């Protein structure tokens, strides 16, 4: 696990400037650093830099940038690479590349050898989490590559025929000549969904490379494509269905065991996050089965009972016989992390579960350098409550159309009768846009986000959703979450929270073979109308008694309404003061000031009320924190 950055430019970016960009990511790689500049063609210079967190082959042989040896009829030093992540099948690939003169036991060198032999299509053979920058001197091309599901981040800035890239926004912001011009349309969408999805970023001309994406840069020309696309892979795998549940369970179990085993290969201490839920408990159980010693497990508990799951995690740990560590966190302990959010989430990010994720990462880092997580189980095996609601909404869609039609009749239109309907009925009656139906969000949220940022041109449609060509709302939303929410929110949250403490998080459920196999399963194996994550739960019950796992999920939550109207109130009032907003020149000062004042007086309606406005206010607050850290101080 590391951080990478670099450039391809005709400008005069010095080696000192490149090192400064690299050092903004010290937390991502405290063990080693490297920075080099190469002379390219047509007046271009190529700069590569990396911060290293040593996981495999802790020797100096793993230093980056790394260069190719003479092999396959190609001269040495013709290919250079910087790389963030892990290639879990590097051992298998190394055997296929046995005629390459390897000098290390690093997966980075396997990437170089694979590229020399197979070209850029070598990425199709790689199973892992990665962000790669590769420079081929023969063709004077630079390639940027991101893993299939977006576990590792990769930003890039294109301007004036030049390219600058980095694992985070910080190295781009540190690059000479960078302009911090905020995109208003992206800001409005952030307020609505609480994260910023690829390919967008908060800044103009800066983008995230999409999951499963490749960018080729050659003397100012850019070409992008996807080597792994959710929709295409889903339909391809659907052509090879597995019809028998027991057969599917056995094959999936085998794939999960192999995925966990490959993620336990490390030259540093390794453990597992454990919440006591299905996914983390199953990953921990398989890891324990695969380990000669008790696996180190970590969980945090909260003093407020409605948020606390530590007792469940402890029960599972005792049953499995792990080496368990837990820590109880009071509200003060969580609140103290709020100020550090913009430093490590260097783009506006408002999923408040980032705070407990940082806390459990800090706890784990005291004893290990690598931690397994259960991320991906909800998206690939139908675990979210939202999916239940979508199944209900699709059944009610005809009734929703009828209600919508009735409320539009002369004499009723404009009477605001929708506001008297239950929020679930409003969601299906008001939202008639076929490209927005799976979002199940009250239109009031959308209107509020648009009102916060005037003339933002906010459009909350996802262009890829119609391309799935799937009629079932539940399946379509699962695919959309894999494409957007999983990489943009969940994996971003885990990456930044773990990297804050130089901890590597690994997600076995997001193994390439597991993801692709999940697409071969009939949807009834995941959701049968009553039970979600059906097949994954069945595997978990092979390891852990059902009564330990079957309970309502609490999740990593924090008391936002209490914080915003309590200890954060003074800062929130400052950020929403009409004069301040007028000087800032981003938001509608009158509207936002009135909205926040009303919120502070009346509070939050709560989930399912249609007026759960603490989410938007928290997103506004975190943006202002970020703005103070990166824009106002500049």
Locate each region found by the language model.
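Cysteine-centered catalytic environments shared across enzyme families
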Residues: 1-345, 357, 361, 542, ...
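Adenosyl-5′-phosphate
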Residues: 1-4, 78, 121, 174, ...
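A generic secondary-structure signal for well-formed alpha-helical elements
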Residues: 25, 176, 263, 291, ...
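Generic hydrophobic alpha-helical membrane-span motif
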Residues: 35, 153-156, 282-285, 380, ...
């Amino acid at each position: 696990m590391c951080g990478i950055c670099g450039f391809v430019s005709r400008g005069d970016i010095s080696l000192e400037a490149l090192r400064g960009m690299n050092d903004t990511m010290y937390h991502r790689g405290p063990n080693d650093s490297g920075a080099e500049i190469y002379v390219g063609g047509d007046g271009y210079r190529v700069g590569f830099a990396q911060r290293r967190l040593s996981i495999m082959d802790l020797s100096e042989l793993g230093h980056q940038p790394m260069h190719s040896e003479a092999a396959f009829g190609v001269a040495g030093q013709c290919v250079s690479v910087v790389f963030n992540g892990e290639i879990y099948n590097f051992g298998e690939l190394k055997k296929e590349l046995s005629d390459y003169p390897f000098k290390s036991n690093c997966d980075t060198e396997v990437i170089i050898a694979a590229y020399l032999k197979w070209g850029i299509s070598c990425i199709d053979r790689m199973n892992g989490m990665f962000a790669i920058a590769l420079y081929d001197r023969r063709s004077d091309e630079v390639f940027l590559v991101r893993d299939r599901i977006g576990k590792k981040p990769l930003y890039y800035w294109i301007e004036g025929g030049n390219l600058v890239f980095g694992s985070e926004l910080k190295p781009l912001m540190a690059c000479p000549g960078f302009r911090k011009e905020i995109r208003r349309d992206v800001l409005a969408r952030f307020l609505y969904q609480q994260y910023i999805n690829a390919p967008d970023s908060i800044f103009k001309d800066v983008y995230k490379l999409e999951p499963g994406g490749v960018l080729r840069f050659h003397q100012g020309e850019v070409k992008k494509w996807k080597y792994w696309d959710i929709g295409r892979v889903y339909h391809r795998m659907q052509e090879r269905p597995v019809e028998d549940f027991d057969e599917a369970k056995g094959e999936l179990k085998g794939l999960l065991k192999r995925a966990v085993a490959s993620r336990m290969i490390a030259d540093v201490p390794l453990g597992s996050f454990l919440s006591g839920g299905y996914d983390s408990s199953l990953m921990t159980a398989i890891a324990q089965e695969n380990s000669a010693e008790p696996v180190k497990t970590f969980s945090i508990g909260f003093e407020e009972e409605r948020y606390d799951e530590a007792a469940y995690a402890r029960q599972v740990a005792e049953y499995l016989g792990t080496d368990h560590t837990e820590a109880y966190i009071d509200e003060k302990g969580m609140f103290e992390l709020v100020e550090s959010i913009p430093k490590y989430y260097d783009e506006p990010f408002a999923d408040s579960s980032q705070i407990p994720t940082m806390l459990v990462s800090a706890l784990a880092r005291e004893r290990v350098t690598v931690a397994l997580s259960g991320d991906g189980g909800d998206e690939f095996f139908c675990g979210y409550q939202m999916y239940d609601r979508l199944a209900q909404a699709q059944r009610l869609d005809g009734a929703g159309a009828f209600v919508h039609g009735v409320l539009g009749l002369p004499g009723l239109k404009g009477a605001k009768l929708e506001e008297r309907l239950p929020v679930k009925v409003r969601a299906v009656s008001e939202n008639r846009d076929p490209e927005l139906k799976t979002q199940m969000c009250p239109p009031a949220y959308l209107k509020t986000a648009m009102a916060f940022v005037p003339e933002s041109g906010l459009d909350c449609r996802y262009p890829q959703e119609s391309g799935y060509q799937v009629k079932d709302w539940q399946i379509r939303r699962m695919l959309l979450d894999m494409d957007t929410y999983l990489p943009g929110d969940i994996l971003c949250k885990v990456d930044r929270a773990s990297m804050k403490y130089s901890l590597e998080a690994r997600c076995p459920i997001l193994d390439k073979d597991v993801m692709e196999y999940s697409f071969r399963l009939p949807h009834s194996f995941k959701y049968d109308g009553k039970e979600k994550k059906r097949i994954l739960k069945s595997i978990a019950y092979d390891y852990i008694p059902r009564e330990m796992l079957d309970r309502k999920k609490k999740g990593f939550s924090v008391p936002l309404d209490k914080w915003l109207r309590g200890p954060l109130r003074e800062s929130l009032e400052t950020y929403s003061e009409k004069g301040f907003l007028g000087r800032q020149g981003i938001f509608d000062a009158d509207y936002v000031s009135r909205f926040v004042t009303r919120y502070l007086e009346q509070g939050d309606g709560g989930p399912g009320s249609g007026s759960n406005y603490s989410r938007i206010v928290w997103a506004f607050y975190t943006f202002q924190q970020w703005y103070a850290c990166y824009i106002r101080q500049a």
